[in-house]
Design a protein with these regions (language model features):
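Carbohydrate-active catalytic/glycan-binding domains of CAZyme proteins
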Residues: 24-377
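Bacterial N-terminal signal peptides
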Residues: 6-17
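Positively charged n-region of N-terminal signal peptides that target proteins for export
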Residues: 1-4
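Sec/Tat signal peptide C-region and signal peptidase I cleavage site
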Residues: 19-22
Length: 377
């Protein structure tokens, strides 16, 4: 078992597990030779606050991207939909909502709906999902995924056929506002389309942008080679990278349109990237489906890159796994721990936000884990 939790809480956790006689103890890890840049997450995850981050009564919350506003408050943009229609209906019922807190650890309070349905004639007319919030030159810039369909908004779990139909329509777009409260300017076209016949022929999803000081942007995205129903026989998921002279576009793919290269994870299924820039490098945290890099399935890894195309992993690439240490001393293996989003302040990751589900699927919400100071600043 790898040590992911911060040292400041380790002694307490070990004492707690020893005194209670529980078998679920933490094991020490032999230190490895330091590398640069260091993995800012491994061994630096502090306890997750019980009751922190964002839970919405009667609703599923899936993921959350947080930014500090000019007023010093923290604004979370999250995907949410009624729990009555089940988890599957993210694809038809997801909407991006705003929640606010005075602390990056929450609890966040629901404020309003950010990008409401606007009609099936629009590419993002019926659902919005995967928010990633950024700020540049006084503007709040929200990257997201949208899709559309030409039937009534579902009030119960949709069929597999309907799921596949709407999934195939996923595209990345961007909206802009002067305030986190809006109003938001949306656009009639997505910023990046799939390319039938190539590795990214099905969708564009999971936007992970860096907006540079001059307003240009680098965008890592997820795609798949074929849409449904062919996707049922080909489940590949990979990352590509594009750039634009301005974050609104136009975007063109780098690396001759080929997928990016992650050392040690070639041909592995990956999703949910988040990237930031510090010290002349791009940094990434993302989910990997296999145990190839981290030793546990459906966990997270850290990588870095000079150009956004070739990514290197450190000696210990693990960023997180599904075991979460809470401030009450409990360690819970979550059913899901996905969509890692990072709050970066002064070039350093300070908090990780996750879409999570408890072991019984009884609560699906956003969870925050503080990160011990250090890392990439």
């Amino acid at each position: 078992m790898k040590l992911l939790f911060g040292a400041s809480f380790l002694a307490f956790s070990l004492a707690l597990s020893t005194s209670s006689g529980e078998a679920n103890t933490l094991q020490s890890v032999t230190a490895t030779t330091p590398v640069r840049p260091e993995n800012p997450f491994f061994g630096n995850l502090e306890p997750a606050p019980v009751g922190g981050s964002f839970t919405r009564e009667g609703h599923i919350v899936w993921g959350g991207s947080v930014i500090r506003g000019e007023d010093g408050r923290y604004y979370m943009f999250a995907s949410s939909w009624p729990e009555s229609v089940t988890m599957r209906n993210w694809v038809t019922n997801s909407e991006i909502v705003l929640a606010v807190s005075d602390s990056p650890e929450g609890p966040f309070t629901y404020e309003n709906l950010v990008l409401p349905p606007r009609g099936s004639e629009y590419w993002d007319g019926m659902i919005t999902h995967n928010p990633s919030i950024h700020r540049h030159d006084g503007k709040y810039v929200l990257f997201y995924v949208g899709s559309t369909y030409n039937f009534e908004r579902p009030t119960e779990m949709v069929s597999r056929e309907t799921y596949e139909q709407v999934w195939n329509g996923k595209r990345i777009g961007v909206a802009v506002a002067d305030s986190p409260y809006g109003p938001w300017t949306r656009f009639d076209q997505p910023i990046l389309e799939p390319r039938p016949g190539f590795w990214d022929g099905a969708i564009t999803s999971n936007p992970a942008p860096v907006i540079h000081e001059d307003g240009s942007a680098l965008l890592v995205y997820k795609s798949a080679p074929v849409p449904y129903p062919a996707r049922n026989q080909n489940k590949a998921l990979d990352f590509g990278v594009a750039e634009a002279p301005h974050y609104l576009g136009p975007y063109h793919r780098l690396n001759n349109g080929q997928k990016i290269r992650i050392a040690g994870a070639e041909d592995e299924r990956v999703e949910d990237p988040y990237i930031w820039q510090a010290n002349g490098l791009y940094h990434m945290v993302a989910k990997i489906f296999s145990e190839k890099l981290t030793g546990q399935r459906e966990s997270g890894f850290y990588a870095y890159s000079v150009d956004g195309i070739d990514w290197t992993v450190p000696d210990e690439p693990t960023a997180y796994d599904r075991r979460v240490l809470f401030t009450d001393g409990t360690i819970v293996e979550q059913k899901k721990l996905e969509r890692p989003q990072v709050l970066v302040e002064d070039g350093r990751p300070t908090h990780l936000y996750f879409a999570t589900a408890d072991p019984e699927w009884s609560k699906i919400y956003n969870l925050v884990i503080p990160v011990t100071p250090g890392g990439t600043d």
